[in-house]
């Protein structure tokens, strides 16, 4: 189980990312449309003004049940060992263990 502080920190980053998403997207669009290099630098400075934690690259996908940030499966939202336990206990419909 991940520490509660890390989970709350991740939730805070998600809120910040949603808040500044439109600003980042519009700034990037402006940079691609303007041919002047000096104007691009000004817009690039504006792009750096939002908080660092509002960048989408700083977000991690976390396990739904344990909060583990690594080895997550997108389709289920679970980490690898929890996914394996749930499949073995038949708690995930449609998921089967492979055998060949």
Curated annotation (Swiss-Prot):
Pfam families: Ribosomal_S14
An individual GO BP term: translation
GO CC annotations on file: chloroplast; small ribosomal subunit
Source organism superkingdom: Eukaryota
Keywords: Chloroplast, Plastid, Ribonucleoprotein, Ribosomal protein, RNA-binding, rRNA-binding
Gene Ontology terms, MF aspect: rRNA binding; structural constituent of ribosome
InterPro entries per record: Ribosomal_uS14, Ribosomal_uS14_bac/plastid, Ribosomal_uS14_CS
Cellular localization per UniProt: Plastid, Chloroplast
Function per UniProt: Binds 16S rRNA, required for the assembly of 30S particles.
NCBIfam families on file: PRK08881.1
Entry's family note: Belongs to the universal ribosomal protein uS14 family.
Assembly and oligomerization: Part of the 30S ribosomal subunit.
Entry protein name: Small ribosomal subunit protein uS14c
Organism in which the protein naturally occurs: Lepidium virginicum (Virginia pepperweed)
């Amino acid at each position: 189980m991940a520490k509660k502080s890390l989970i709350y920190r991740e939730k805070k980053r998600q809120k910040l990312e949603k808040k500044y998403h439109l600003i980042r997207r519009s700034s990037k669009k402006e940079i691609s449309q303007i041919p002047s290099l000096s104007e691009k630098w000004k817009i690039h400075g504006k792009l750096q003004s939002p908080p660092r934690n509002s960048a989408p690259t700083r977000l991690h996908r976390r396990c739904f049940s344990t909060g583990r940030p690594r080895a997550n499966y997108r389709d289920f939202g679970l980490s690898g060992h929890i996914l394996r336990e749930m499949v073995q206990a038949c708690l995930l419909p449609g998921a089967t263990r492979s055998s060949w």
